[in-house]
Amino acid sequence: MSAVDAFFDTSVLLYLLSKDAAKADRVEELLAARGTISVQVLNEFAAVSLRKLGMPLPEVKEILDTVRAVCDVVPLTVETHDRALAIVARYGFSLYDSLVIAAALIAGSKRLYSEDLQHGQVIDRQLRVVNPFVSR
């Protein structure tokens, strides 16, 4: 699998911090195969880690540096914004979920690893939502 094939949602990456070893190991396994994320995913991960989990900034930065080393990072652009609004209109997803989906579509990803969206759903005949914690 190439980096462009898999796109990671924040909901999955946060399991790197989980006490659930099986889920943390699964995310590490997927990341070892590389993937793509957006700047939004980095921001959401940092916000949850700092605010909700109370982690120290240096620790959060270290984890994000590791993720960035194995994932391509795509920017948020006006194109991403416009595509996200079209996804909101067509599918009814929240704006923030739609921004992640739009970034994955623009990156050419085939799989979106997410725990927040419907497992197996195909978006725009290109992107399949995969919950990596559903039995394989």
Go through each PLM region and give its residues.
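Structured helix-beta-strand junction loops
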Residues: 33-34, 69-70, 91, 108
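Acidic catalytic patch
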Residues: 65, 70-90
